[in-house]
């Protein structure tokens, strides 16, 4: 924008094409465009565009992957007075019908960062959320022994923007969930193994305040994907993916409360089989943001629970709360550990 007016929103990224014949990967999704800046005197920043989804592998050629998703665009910043734009969300990773251990579903796109608030006044924009990882959509029946495809990792959340002279910091985006691993085996196959679940994405950092304003909350870590099932005698389920890590809360302004820390995501469950797969570990929580002069510290995030399985996953550690203001304010509480 020029002197007065809002910045334009960024365009969305296009979806990747599907792969429908023979061996090959789904196409990658396009990235979202960045939002425009607000006017020199007054105006909000534009929102970033969302990332495009990754294309799927549909035909199921051996070793074929799902396409990676596009990332969200950054939110535009305000200049003097106005709010920052929100970051765009990441696209979802493409699924795969590939029937081999080296087939991998597409990774989810990362969320874009939020724009900053105006120098004089304005709240900062929130970070975009990470996209979910793709999943396996077919059962592997060949190989010695058959092994399922791997689920895609979730994308990470974008960071919240920083506030201006007065205003709150932006909230961090949440991570995207991990995709599910593929099933493997037939009734008479021996020793088949389910595919691994994808890891959950991490949350984005909370943005800071300036003079008057709260820090933004940190983003939440996402759940890990479940492992695929093993089929037949002596089969083993796939291991669950790890939960994503929470992100730290933002620092408060001189007067204001610190942002709460994001919680960790739960680990994915191990797949079924004659022997179940192991559960994924839960993600750790993140520390709360500190207050500065007057205000309370943000609460710390709790750890995610471990997934179920032959060996259950370990719960993530909870994190400490932020410190209270030096003149007045209480510290934040400590987040609970995951089980």
PLM feature spans:
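Collagen triple-helix signature
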Residues: 1-338
């Amino acid at each position: 924008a020029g002197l007065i007016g809002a910045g334009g929103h960024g365009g969305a990224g296009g979806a990747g094409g599907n792969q429908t014949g023979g061996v090959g990967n789904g196409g990658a999704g396009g990235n979202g465009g960045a939002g425009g800046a607000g006017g020199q005197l007054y105006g909000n920043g534009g929102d970033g565009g969302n990332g495009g989804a990754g294309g799927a592998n549909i035909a199921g050629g051996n070793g074929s992957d799902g396409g990676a998703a596009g990332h969200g665009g950054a939110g535009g910043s305000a200049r003097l007075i106005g709010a920052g734009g929100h970051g765009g969300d990441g696209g979802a990773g493409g699924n795969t019908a590939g029937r081999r251990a080296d087939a991998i579903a597409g990774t989810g796109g990362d969320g874009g960062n939020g724009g900053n608030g105006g120098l004089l006044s304005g709240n900062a924009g929130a970070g975009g959320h990470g996209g979910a990882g793709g999943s396996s959509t077919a059962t592997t029946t060949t190989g010695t022994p058959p092994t399922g495809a791997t689920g895609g990792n979730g994308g990470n959340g974008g960071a919240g923007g920083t506030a201006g002279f007065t205003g709150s910091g932006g909230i961090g985006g949440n991570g995207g969930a991990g995709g599910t691993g593929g099933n493997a085996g037939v009734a008479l196959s021996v020793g088949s193994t389910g595919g691994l679940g994808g890891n959950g994405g991490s949350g984005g950092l909370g943005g800071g305040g300036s003079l008057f304003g709260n820090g933004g909350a940190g983003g939440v870590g996402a759940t890990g994907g479940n492992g695929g099932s093993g089929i037949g005698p002596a089969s083993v389920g796939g291991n669950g993916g790890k939960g994503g890590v929470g992100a730290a809360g933002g620092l408060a302004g001189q007067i204001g409360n610190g942002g709460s820390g994001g919680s960790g995501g739960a680990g994915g469950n191990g797949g079924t089989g004659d022997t179940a797969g192991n559960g994924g570990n839960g993600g750790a929580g993140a520390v709360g943001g500190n207050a500065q002069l007057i205000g309370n510290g943000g609460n710390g995030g709790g750890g995610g629970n471990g997934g179920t399985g032959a060996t259950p996953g370990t719960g993530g550690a909870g994190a400490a709360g932020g410190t209270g203001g030096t003149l007045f304010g209480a510290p934040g509480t400590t987040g609970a550990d995951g089980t």
